[in-house]
Amino acid sequence: YNFNVYTSCTARRK
């Protein structure tokens, strides 16, 4: 899994 994608999703949720 791409960590960048995960961070993007989390940042957007926050």
UniProtKB/Swiss-Prot annotation:
Keywords: Cell wall, Secreted
Source domain of life: Eukaryota
Cellular component aspect of the GO annotation: extracellular region
Localization of this protein: Secreted, Cell wall
Keyword Secreted tagged: yes
Protein name, entry field: Monosaccharide transporter
